[in-house]
């Protein structure tokens, strides 16, 4: 049975830093945060049962910080429509990654119309026209409710990454938060 997540991404105010500005605690976690390949495909190799849980997909405004990262001017923010898609990637019925994607409405109507609970990564990484920009990273200490939900001790750090993908004249952003049971936090000796 899949665990339901009651927290919204990104769990409060988050400061994103350009790659190289944060000290990542170990090489194993760094390999997950900075891997430019398909996260979906990598997660699928670490479990027997992989699922995408669609939390929501709706037309809404992105945050001001997301618009800045997407390179969208204030004038364009009012004119363009965006879809915000939030999913949880589960491995063997454990929530591993919470992902938030900001996708131009026009792209949803063309290429992503029937995405539903399918992984976005299957589209992005099977089309050479998608070009990934450099990562930004974040590290936070979640609130007490989050720690309690996962049975975690205080001072537990949660890591995430985000990057912009350029596709033709469009830019879309994917942010991924590695949840506590994600393989990114496991010692590499325990990886499949």
From Swiss-Prot:
Enzyme class: lyase
Compartment(s): Cytoplasm
EC number(s) reported in the record: 4.1.3.40
InterPro entries documented for this protein: Chorismate--pyruvate_lyase, Chorismate_lyase_/UTRA_dom_sf
Molecular functions per Gene Ontology: chorismate lyase activity
Pathway(s) annotated for this protein in UniProt: Cofactor biosynthesis; ubiquinone biosynthesis
Catalytic activity: chorismate = 4-hydroxybenzoate + pyruvate
Residues where substrate binds: 85, 120, 176
GO cellular component: cytosol
Keyword flag Cytoplasm: yes
Key words, A-Z: Cytoplasm, Lyase, Pyruvate, Ubiquinone biosynthesis
Top-level lineage group: Bacteria
GO biological process, one term: pyruvate biosynthetic process
Family: Belongs to the UbiC family.
Biological function: Removes the pyruvyl group from chorismate, with concomitant aromatization of the ring, to provide 4-hydroxybenzoate (4HB) for the ubiquinone pathway.
Classification via HAMAP family: UbiC
Protein name per UniProt: Probable chorismate pyruvate-lyase
Lineage: Bacteria, Pseudomonadati, Pseudomonadota, Gammaproteobacteria, Alteromonadales
This protein's encoding gene: ubiC
């Amino acid at each position: 049975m899949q665990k339901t997540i009651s927290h919204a991404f990104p769990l409060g105010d988050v400061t994103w830093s350009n790659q190289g500005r944060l000290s990542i605690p170990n090489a194993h976690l760094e390999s997950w945060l900075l891997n430019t390949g398909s996260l979906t495909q990598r997660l699928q190799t670490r479990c027997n049962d992989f699922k995408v849980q669609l939390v929501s997909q709706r037309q809404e405004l992105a945050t001001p910080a997301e618009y800045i990262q997407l390179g969208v001017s204030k004038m364009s923010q009012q004119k363009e429509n965006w879809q915000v898609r939030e999913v949880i990637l589960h491995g063997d019925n454990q929530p591993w990654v919470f992902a938030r994607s900001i996708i131009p409405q026009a792209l949803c109507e063309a290429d992503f119309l029937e995405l539903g609970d399918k992984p976005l990564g299957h589209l992005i990484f099977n089309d050479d026209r998608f070009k990934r920009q450099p990562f930004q990273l974040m590290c936070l200490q979640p609130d007490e409710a989050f720690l309690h939900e996962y049975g975690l001790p205080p001072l537990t750090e949660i890591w995430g990454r985000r990057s912009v993908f350029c596709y033709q004249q469009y830019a879309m952003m994917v942010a991924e938060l590695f949840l506590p049971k994600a393989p990114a936090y496991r010692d590499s000796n325990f990886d499949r």
